[in-house]
UniProtKB/Swiss-Prot annotation:
One of its GO terms (cellular component) is cytosol. It comes from the Bacteria. Catalyzes the decarboxylation of four acetate groups of uroporphyrinogen-III to yield coproporphyrinogen-III. The record marks 78 as: Transition state stabilizer. Pathway: Porphyrin-containing compound metabolism; protoporphyrin-IX biosynthesis; coproporphyrinogen-III from 5-aminolevulinate: step 4/4. The keyword Repeat does not apply. It holds the Pfam family URO-D. GO terms for biological process: protoporphyrinogen IX biosynthetic process from glutamate. Belongs to the uroporphyrinogen decarboxylase family. Its EC number is 4.1.1.37. It comes from Pseudomonas fluorescens (strain ATCC BAA-477 / NRRL B-23932 / Pf-5). This is Uroporphyrinogen decarboxylase. The gene is hemE.
Length: 355
């Protein structure tokens, strides 16, 4: 494979020296970009965009073509590809978000679920990874990703997104045996899926635990973190002669950073409710940190965006081990020039911390 021209993202994840703080944005290929909206219209719908490797490659590269400051590309896909490959029948309803034709509600439902083969059942994702990696031609590293077992389980049990996770939590407390079996199957599936992405060309991987923060402290340890730890222990950590860093991101996980840092990953994603300086004092000796600007700051004027970037950089302080990002995904209404101001500010203002 082509040698990397810009590896500062991978270096920062491993706390190796960098010239400036690297930056990328969760959902950087998304609806805030007019070129993305045009591609989505051409594809017909969101799933057609995900399932066609050429379209997935096109939209993955769009933010990089617009913003030369981006230090990483992230595979354009959806976290719900795994449940779909298990036969749940994923579809999207306008204004409703993701839905499943089948809902998991009993132990028998869970026992019947297959563990998808990443190459046979999710080959379109592997093809997208290899296509994107080829087209990147060493420009920046490519991030692969998956949802966490707990997060995927909530969608499968609820039948879609949820505000209170009533059905998922009822199963967790009322029928923990069933929930553990579901989470175990998902952990096996995620491990195989991420290893497939790494073999196809992903140079780092992130596990999105979007709904881990909805759990109590005890339930988080048992039903979310334990399964992410299992996945991390089964991942390929070196490929093509280079380490493959692993990032864990639990939204709402700021209370549990110490235990997340013990899970074996290289880096922790932080949402915007954490102070990054405090997080560094708590776990910075073990892991690098990724984050953590509130994405709604991007609605503000460029000077306000710049001030918030400066504040977060100062809070983290000197040295490597910080990948700048948002604390969650960029939202569709953000002006593209505001995202550009954010990315420019990170590189410009961070050089002083790496002298």
């Amino acid at each position: 494979m082509t040698a990397l021209k810009n590896d500062r993202f991978l270096r920062a994840l491993l706390k190796q020296p960098v010239d400036v703080t690297p930056v990328w944005m969760m959902r950087q290929a998304g609806r805030y970009l007019p070129e993305y909206r045009a591609s989505r219209a051409n594809a017909g719908d969101f799933m057609s965009l995900c399932m066609n490797p050429e379209f997935a490659c096109e939209v993955t590269l769009q933010p990089l073509d617009r913003y030369p400051q981006l230090d990483a590309a992230i595979l354009f896909s959806d976290i719900l590809t795994i449940p779909d490959a298990m036969g749940q029948g994923l579809y999207f309803e306008t204004g409703e978000g993701p839905r499943f034709k089948k809902v998991v509600s009993t132990l028998a439902d869970i026992e019947a679920l297959p563990i998808p083969d990443p190459h046979k059942d999710l080959g379109y994702v592997m093809d997208a990874v290899s296509t994107i990696r080829r087209e990147l031609n060493g420009r920046v590293p490519l991030i692969g990703f998956s949802g966490s077992p707990w997060t995927l389980a909530t969608y499968m049990v609820e039948g879609g997104s949820s505000k209170d996770f009533r059905k998922s939590k009822a199963m967790l407390y009322d029928n923990p045996q069933a929930m553990h079996l579901l989470l175990d199957k998902l952990a096996q599936s995620v491990t195989a899926y991420l290893n497939g992405q790494i073999r196809a060309g992903a140079q780092a991987v992130q596990i999105f635990d979007s709904w881990g923060g909805s759990l109590s402290a005890a339930a988080y340890q048992e039903f979310s973190l334990a399964y992410m730890r299992k996945i991390v222990s089964g991942l390929i950590r070196e490929h093509d002669g280079r380490k493959v860093p692993v990032i864990l991101f639990t939204k709402g996980g700021g209370l549990w950073l110490e235990s997340i840092a013990d899970a074996g990953a290289d880096s922790l994603g932080l949402d915007w409710t954490c102070d990054i300086g405090e997080a560094r004092r708590r776990v910075g000796s073990k892991v690098s940190l990724q984050g953590n600007m509130d994405p709604t700051v991007l609605y503000a004027n460029p000077q306000a965006i710049r001030s918030e970037v400066a504040r977060i950089l100062a809070s983290y302080g000197k040295g490597s081990g910080h990948v700048f990002n948002l604390g969650h995904g960029i939202t569709p209404e953000v002006k593209p020039e505001h995202a550009g101001a954010f990315l420019e500010a990170v590189h410009e203002l961070s050089a002083q911390y790496h002298e």
